[in-house]
Swiss-Prot record:
Protein origin, superkingdom: Bacteria
Gene3D superfamilies documented for this protein: Spore Coat Polysaccharide Biosynthesis Protein SpsA, Chain A
One GO molecular-function entry: 3-deoxy-manno-octulosonate cytidylyltransferase activity
Organism: Methylococcus capsulatus (strain ATCC 33009 / NCIMB 11132 / Bath)
Keyword presence, Nuclease: no
Primary location: cytoplasm
Name of the protein this chain belongs to: 3-deoxy-manno-octulosonate cytidylyltransferase
GO cellular component: cytosol
Protein encoded by which gene: kdsB
Function: Activates KDO (a required 8-carbon sugar) for incorporation into bacterial lipopolysaccharide in Gram-negative bacteria.
EC numbers on record: 2.7.7.38
Family listed: Belongs to the KdsB family.
Location(s), subcellular: Cytoplasm
GO biological process, alphabetically ordered: CMP-keto-3-deoxy-D-manno-octulosonic acid biosynthetic process; lipopolysaccharide biosynthetic process
Transmembrane segments: none
């Protein structure tokens, strides 16, 4: 597969918790501009902002990115990516990284590493990231999604539950896994081949994704493989709530003179 990759940033205007989230101000510019900068730092051959609102497209005018107005009815960012791939007529082996529009502090090096890892594998058409869990309480936190892989770093399952279940330690109520047990948290950034994006839109939702509220389980349910790329640390969290926005502003003001 080619070494070049494209980054698509799906950015909806509507948000239950933070309406107009991509346009909210961070350090004197809209959040979506920060996300575009992270994508450009990764060295992508092309960066596309896929949005359902002209105001978001206007916010990135002047940046070396392509803004594309997409349909409003998409149920997920992945479906929005698939529309972009189809309209741009990307070849089947084009590598496409999905960077959410509320990730202003994403590590650009992780985006490149993700795309490069997928490009080296012939057995997977989807890849994502995972980092070690160091705090035992996170194993039981349903907001921390865990991932279990096989010996080739292909995902076996994603869950909000404590997986793998340490039968000895957890049954005794210790709440601390056996030393050396490799618990990993999923980092919700994905890379796909354009051919897989075209396949994805034809897949029926699965019971597992409805129960866990994890879209990636649809891929496993239909027998497809997800490469899980191990990284040492998780990036700073994205912005989902008003409290997250204030934290992001404090983080940025502390980093910027």
């Amino acid at each position: 597969m080619p070494a070049d990759f494209t980054i698509v940033i799906p950015a909806r205007y509507g948000s239950t918790r933070l309406p107009g989230k991509p346009l909210l101000e961070l350090g004197g510019k809209p959040m979506i501009a920060h996300v575009c900068e992270r994508a450009l730092e990764a060295g992508a051959a092309e960066v596309v902002v896929a949005t359902d609102d002209a105001r978001i497209a206007e916010a990135v005018d002047g940046l070396p990115v392509t803004a594309m107005l997409t349909r409003t009815e998409h149920a997920s960012g992945t479906e929005r990516l698939a529309e972009v791939a189809e309209r741009r007529a990307w070849s089947d082996d084009t590598l496409v990284v999905n960077l959410q529009g509320d990730e202003p502090f994403m590590d650009a090096a992780l985006l490149r590493a993700l795309a490069e890892a997928l490009g080296r594998r012939e057995d997977c058409r989807v890849a994502t990231l995972a980092a070690p869990i160091h705090r035992p309480e996170e194993i039981f936190d349903p907001n921390v999604v865990k991932v279990v892989t096989d010996g080739e770093n292909r995902a076996l399952y994603f869950s909000r539950a404590a997986v793998p279940w340490d039968r000895e330690s957890f049954a005794e109520g210790a709440g601390v896994p056996m030393p050396g047990m490799p618990y990993r948290r999923h980092i919700g950034v994905y890379a796909y081949t354009a051919s897989y994006l075209r396949r994805y839109v034809d897949l029926e939702p699965s019971p597992l994704e409805h129960v866990e509220r994890l879209e990636q389980l649809r891929i496993l349910w239909h027998g497809d493989r997800i490469l899980v790329v191990p990284v040492e640390g998780a990036p700073a969290p994205g912005v989902d709530t008003a409290a997250d926005l204030e934290r992001a502003r404090r983080h940025l003001s502390g980093r910027t003179p």
